[in-house]
């Protein structure tokens, strides 16, 4: 690509690392004596530190949400369509922070990191994490950057769950919550999909109980299958039909079980292959468990409105009509609970053919609604 970046891009960005040496107590009962978080920033923090926006990523996301790491990069960050000058999260107004979560595999301390107690990768010995644990770790990052209160915490899917948890755990630190394509907890069906994905990894002979790094291998097949299952749930039936239909890769059937015959088979195998080369299997297990465990209403006997009684943020909840992983009905559960708790909330349900992945795709109505809300935030 050209060395000149698009006018609405944040341009060249450099990841940074923050190290924390104060122990972090975790929900599982264990603690991390120290940890590192990799993050990027876009825009400029104003003198009163009142214009900061935190981006929380989804299951396979990371800190590189916008811009480019090099002039030769083929693609920008994963949410570049939403972050930059004149975009919904306008870097002419906001100072944006995007991080790789604790337990991740893109530089932050996680299963592939070296355990200082053993000198070997944590592997399966890395503690199980929850959404609350992530929020607690993110608070420290904000403080390190001089941010005591976020103008907004924003996220899609698992990122939206983090944004919601922020308003519950630290109500005084968040003015606005933008929760996109999310849910107040996983359904039994969603937990089931996660379990199938985990079993694909756990039963891969190359997993070695999570110590595959010590063996110099990766559970490639398990990761491929996990990603293939997950990817099906991110797309709608209509979008898969439109994109692939029943199209064949060649003009005839092979009448065997090993050939890649349909275009959709080729797509899924490509996605699985690509994912298995860049993602850590233990991190995948951790992320899916954090999803499964998320249930903030459990502290009040399942009453989400009671859980939200003390929150002070304003909320923007968005969903997409063809998202069956986290359907609009799940977003409306959050909206209904906020209304019952007499909180300020706006809700936008967007017609989109793209399923759960719609929160990553810049369709006009989505961009307009997102921009309209963010532009209302006083800084």
Swiss-Prot record:
The entry describes its oligomerization and partners as: Homodimer.
Protein's gene? metXS
Q: What does the record give as EC number?
A: 2.3.1.46
Organism of derivation? Pseudomonas putida (strain ATCC 47054 / DSM 6125 / CFBP 8728 / NCIMB 11950 / KT2440)
What the record says about activity regulation is: Requires MetW for activity.
The name under which this protein is listed is Homoserine O-succinyltransferase
**Gene Ontology molecular functions:** homoserine O-acetyltransferase activity; homoserine O-succinyltransferase activity
UniProt KW keywords: Acyltransferase, Amino-acid biosynthesis, Cytoplasm, Methionine biosynthesis, Transferase
Q: What class of enzyme is it?
A: transferase
Q: Which pairs of Cys residues are joined through disulfide bonds in the record?
A: none
């Amino acid at each position: 690509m050209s060395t000149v970046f698009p006018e609405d891009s944040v341009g060249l960005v450099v990841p940074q690392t923050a190290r924390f040496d104060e122990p972090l107590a975790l929900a599982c009962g264990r603690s991390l004596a120290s940890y590192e978080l990799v993050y990027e920033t876009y825009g400029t923090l104003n003198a009163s530190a009142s214009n900061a926006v935190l981006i929380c990523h989804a299951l396979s996301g990371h800190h590189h949400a916008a811009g480019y790491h090099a002039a030769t990069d083929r693609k920008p960050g994963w949410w570049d369509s939403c972050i930059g000058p004149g975009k919904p999260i306008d870097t002419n107004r906001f100072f944006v922070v995007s991080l790789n979560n604790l337990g991740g595999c893109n530089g932050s301390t996680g299963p592939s990191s070296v355990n200082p107690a053993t000198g070997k990768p944590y592997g399966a010995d890395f503690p199980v994490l929850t959404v609350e644990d992530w929020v607690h770790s993110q608070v420290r990052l904000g403080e390190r950057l001089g941010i005591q209160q976020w103008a907004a915490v924003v996220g899609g899917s698992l990122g939206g769950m983090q944004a919601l948890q922020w308003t519950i755990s630290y109500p005084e630190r968040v003015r606005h919550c933008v929760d996109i394509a999310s849910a107040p907890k996983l359904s039994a069906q969603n937990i089931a999909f996660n379990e199938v994905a985990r079993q694909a990894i756990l039963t891969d002979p190359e997993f070695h109980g999570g110590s595959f790094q010590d063996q110099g291998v990766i559970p490639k097949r398990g990761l491929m299958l996990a990603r293939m299952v997950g990817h099906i749930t991110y797309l709608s039936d209509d979008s898969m039909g439109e994109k692939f239909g029943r199209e064949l890769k060649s003009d005839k059937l092979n009448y065997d079980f090993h050939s890649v015959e349909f275009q959709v088979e080729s797509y899924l195998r490509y996605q699985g292959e690509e994912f298995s080369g860049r993602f850590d299997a233990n991190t995948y297990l951790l992320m899916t468990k954090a999803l499964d465990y998320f249930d903030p209403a459990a502290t009040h006997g399942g009453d989400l409105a009671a859980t939200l009684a003390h929150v002070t943020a304003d909320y923007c909840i968005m969903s997409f009509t063809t998202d069956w992983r986290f359907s609009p009905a799940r977003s409306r559960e959050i909206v209904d609970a906020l209304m019952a708790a007499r909180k300020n909330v706006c809700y936008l349900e967007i017609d989109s053919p793209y399923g759960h992945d719609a929160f990553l795709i810049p369709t006009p109505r989505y961009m307009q609604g997102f921009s309209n809300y963010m532009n209302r935030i006083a800084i």
